[in-house]
Structures are given as structure tokens and as C-alpha cells.
Amino acid sequence: MIRVICNNETVELPKGATAADFASKIKNSHYFAGVVINDQIKDLSTTLNEGDTLRFVTFEDSEGREIFLHTSAHILAQAVLRLWPQAVPTIGPVINQGFYYDFANLSVSEEDLLAIENMMEQIVQEKLEVSKKTFNGKEEALKEFMHNAFKAELIQELPEGESITAYSQGEFMDLCRGPHLPSTAPVKAFKLLRTSAAYWRGDPSRESLVRIYGISFPTTKELKEHLHQLEEAKKRDHRVLGAKLDLFSQQECSAGMPFFHPRGMIVWDALIGYWQRLHQLAGYKQILTPQLMNRSLWETSGHWSNYKANMYTLKIDEEDYAIKPMNCPGCMLYYKTRLHSYKEFPLRIAEIGHVHRYEVSGALSGLMRVRAFHQDDAHVFLTPEQVEEETLNILNLVSELYSTFGLEYHLELSTRPEKDTIGSDELWELATSALERALINSNTPFIINPGDGAFYGPKIDIHVKDAIQRTWQCGTIQLDMFLPERFELEYTNAQGEKSTPIMLHRALFGSIERFLGILIEHFKGKFPLWLSPEHIRLITVADRHQPHAKELAAAWQKLGLVVTVDDSNESVSKKIRNAQNMQVNYMVTLGDREIEENTLAIRTRDNRVLNAMTVETFINTILEEKNSLSLTPLL
């Protein structure tokens, strides 16, 4: 017999028992997708050993969902090969919203997706067992996949001695690390979403491929809910709303580098202004560093050797320069402009820097995936003893910022990777424990991602949930034990000796362009008044009312409100409709009665007609709504 631990209980099992054997004794075990054994995700077919700690996962868990979607990708590939035997499967990973599979030697259209879905349904109905095969070295694996050059390339690149595995279901076998579902049966609901062109390994110089995207769920109900969410997402698409509301545009001459229009800049300025006020109150000092810096800087930071493929470089006076892809190195140079003492720590330095990173054209998408964007970075220099308290300060700042926009979020703590890290075990333990204690003290739920930290330190990622329950990874808090050392940063400690500071690198919005795209979709273009590109539109009934309208607009603009006048020849109803289509918060109609009685006829963008009110009452309420950063109308 062997003893294993599950849910903090010790269980005895026969020697040689698998996780599936154990699961069969547990109620509702048919929902299990896999098992986490000693913090490693595994197949249910895995043999258990003495002392193993188990946690079974379902579709509701991130690990279980990945297994489910990965098996779904294999079902897709098997279906395609049954319909088009000449197709060559390449890779089929899980992505944020489902999965895809890339094929060479295949030509399909959107009309073919239904036929593929029908074949996938047949494969699910066959309840094919999924089994794992471990090859005895590269030679055996290459022999198995000798007719697939893409798989052979992947095999050849594997380090010597690394385990090489494949998974089979029926006649289909795929090179894969796994894990997978025990059979095809649980994949009861799926939908193929679209096709697109792709390149092998994302390299335009390599083979052209066809990519098929899909999504899958354990039940039809969940699939229907997801498809409804996708339809709702289409209505909220920031690219469509951005054009409709005249916020920004994309130009062919600068792919991935958005043009912000005057209305978009009003939203931008409101967003940045709020960020600056918040950070000033939190003790941050703002800097601005150059976009173009010499190669020597990027060699010191490590970007030249590790990130050059994503950088835009050029020569000036026969020397190499690069447009900055990140703000961090510039802040290191600022730190070195003077001497520092432990007495000024934590030293909080913030920058909204314009950065550029190369992305392949096929990956670009509106404001969400760009080549040029602004990042709201801050670097906090501190002593090791200050890490926990300062992390808690940042987490409190995160809470205040995201609640201002009505956004829910969750946190993920990523710990030390197994290989290729810098810093001592003691320092890693100190840093990770400090971040974890800060998370606990913040009373915010979080999960731990073992081994998913950066090579230079542990990190906390901030995942935001929008109005239709999608999650977006926005901000991050990273403890950096690397750059201060590379740049030879120093401070005088309490003993009067020179020490290297610890650095917390954090971004709350992340990419401001991306965050703005999220906000457009979250609010469906209906910005709260303080963020809105147009607070009030004055609508005249006749030409004789124009002077009064312009007088009011000028007075209100001096109060910091964004006010326009529609004195066109359109009918009043058409003017109101135009304003509502542009999501103007309030429409004020001016006619003879309003001017005589010094009152206002007010309508909201949701077509609520308000009781007539005085100018003073209206403006005082509007200013309160704006200055309080209210998410809901006060009228």
C-alpha cells in the first residue's frame, strides 16, 4: 500500500494505483480533467507514489480548463485530417479565449467550419480513449513523425535527454507534452469561430498556414452563454466605437500606432490627469526620459542581447541607437544623477513613457495590440525591510484606481522559476514572503502561480474583469533584483556603508492605450461624465436662440466642462438623436420659454426627459458629478 494526501487527508491506495483509480472512488469524478501532483499538472492516468500530494482539477479550474481546451484542439486536428487527409498539422495551443490549430497544405473557408464541427461531434460520440506515449529518445520520435517536417523541427530543437511524448486518440497521434483528458467524451459543446492566415512560428519568411479558432465547454448551456458574450463583445468592440465616437483612428502609414482625435484626447487627458493626481497624493515624483537612447544603455540593461528583435534601432553618427521598448533603463539613469540615502526611501519615481515594441502585423488589433503605446511605469527604490509595507501601499493604490472605474480584479503571485534566476535563495525567500504577506494583509483574494515569476524576482499580476465578465491582464508589481545591480545603483545605508537598493517596478494601467480600449468596451462607449469627451450639448430651437446658447457654453467651459452648441438647421429631434448617438451625457434644448424663464430643458443620452431646472441647479449638479468621479448620473 501507499499513502497519498488529498484535501489535507491521508488516503491509503494499492501500490501502482493511478490518479484515475483514486478518482473513481470520489463523487462526481467524471468532471475531473486532470490532477495536480506535488504542484505539477498531470494526466489522470499518472501512477501515484508514496507521499504524493494531490489536487483534482475540473473545467472550473484554470489548469483543468487548459487540459479541456487542449484536448479540444486535438479533436479539431483529428477532424480536419479525416476530412482533408493531405493537411499537415503543425501546432494547436490553448489561448485566452479558446484554442486554435495551424495547418499546412490546407485550404478551407468559413463555410467549411460546419463540416469540421460535424466531424468533431462524431469523434466525441466515439468516446475515444486518449493515451500517452513516451519515446525512447529523438530518433524514435523522428521516425514516428518523419512525414511531418514541422513536428520534426520541434523534436530536433528539444534538449538532449528531455522527455518526448505524444498523445493518441483513435487513428490520430500528436506530438505533445500534455496533459489531456482521459477520452474525447467530455467535450460535449464546441464551436469553431473563424479561420485566418498564419505563418509557421509567426515568421513571415516561413511557411504559410491556415489557422482555425475554436472554443469548447462541458455543457451546451455554457457554450450558449459564451457565444452570447461574444455577440455582446462585438457590440462593444472598441475599434467600432472608437470610430463611431470619433475617438481614434488607424492609418496604413503607421500600422499599430493609433491616431488620437480631439474627442479621444479629452478622454486621454481626463485619464492621465486622474492618474497624476492619484500618484502625487501617494508620494510619487514624475519624470520623463528620452525615447531614443544609445546602444550602450541597452547593453547594460540586457535588452540588446535579449530583446533586440522587438526593438526599433537606427544609426546616428555611426553609432547604434534604439527607441525605448521599456521605461526602466531611463529611470536607472535618473537615479544615478545624485547620491541617495536610506532616509529618503521608499523613493517613488513615476513615468508615463512612450514606448515602441515590434509586433507582427497580423497580431495588431486596435488599441489592444499595438507597436507604440504609453506605459504608466513607476520604480520604487527601497531597502529589503520595506518591501512588504510598500507592496501593501501599491496594492491599496491598485484598489483605489480600479474601483474608480468600477472594475473588479483578481491578483496572481508568481514565484521563482526553477532555472536561470539571479539572486540568493535567501533573498528570493525574503522577497516572495514579503509579497505574499502584503497580499494577505490587503484582504484581496489571490492565487499562486508556482515558478511563473521573472528571472529577476517574483511578481504580482493584476487581472481586470469587465462588464461582460472578460478578464484582461493589465497592471503588474515586480520585485527587481537585477537592474539595480546591472546599473550599479547605490545608496548609503544606516551604517554609513554603500548598498544596492531593492526595486519594485509597477504599472497600474499597463499600456494606457490598451486600458482605454478596455474602458471603451467596459462602458460600451457610455463614459461616466468625468471621462466623457462631451459633457453637454446645447441644442437651439431657432437661430434667435444661438447667442444665448453660445453665452452659456462659454460660461460653462470656464468651469472645466466640455460643452458644444448644435446650431445647425436640423430639426430638434434630429439634433437630439445625433447627440445621443455620440453618447453625449446631457442635451440641453433652448427655446423661447427656456430663455424667458431662465430654465433648461434637459434630456439624457438614455432618453430620460428631466424636469425643467434652473441653470444654477443644473451646473452645480453636473460639477458635483464630474468632480466626484461618479460612475452614475446624478440627474
Swiss-Prot record:
Matches recorded under Gene3D superfamilies: 3.10.20.30, Anticodon-binding domain, Bira Bifunctional Protein, Domain 2, Threonyl-trna Synthetase, Chain A, domain 2
Annotated keywords: Aminoacyl-tRNA synthetase, ATP-binding, Cytoplasm, Ligase, Metal-binding, Nucleotide-binding, Protein biosynthesis, RNA-binding, tRNA-binding, Zinc
Catalytic activity: tRNA(Thr) + L-threonine + ATP = L-threonyl-tRNA(Thr) + AMP + diphosphate + H(+)
Cofactor binding description: Binds 1 zinc ion per subunit.
Localization, UniProt: Cytoplasm
Cofactor(s) listed: Zn(2+)
Segments of this protein annotated with the region Catalytic: 237-528
GO molecular function, one term: ATP binding
Listed PROSITE patterns: AA_TRNA_LIGASE_II (PS50862), TGS (PS51880)
Annotated binding of Zn(2+), by residue: C328, H379, H505
Principal cellular location given in the protein's record: cytoplasm
Occurrences of domain TGS (ranges): 1-58
Annotated SUPFAM superfamilies: Class II aaRS ABD-related (SSF52954), Class II aaRS and biotin synthetases (SSF55681), TGS-like (SSF81271), ThrRS/AlaRS common domain (SSF55186)
GO cellular component, one term: cytoplasm
One annotated GO biological process: threonyl-tRNA aminoacylation
EC numbers, comma separated: 6.1.1.3
Function: Catalyzes the attachment of threonine to tRNA(Thr) in a two-step reaction: L-threonine is first activated by ATP to form Thr-AMP and then transferred to the acceptor end of tRNA(Thr). Also edits incorrectly charged L-seryl-tRNA(Thr).
Subunit structure: Homodimer.
Family: Belongs to the class-II aminoacyl-tRNA synthetase family.
Name of this chain's protein: Threonine--tRNA ligase
Species, as recorded: Chlamydia caviae (strain ATCC VR-813 / DSM 19441 / 03DC25 / GPIC) (Chlamydophila caviae)
Lineage: Bacteria, Pseudomonadati, Chlamydiota, Chlamydiia, Chlamydiales
Gene responsible for this protein: thrS
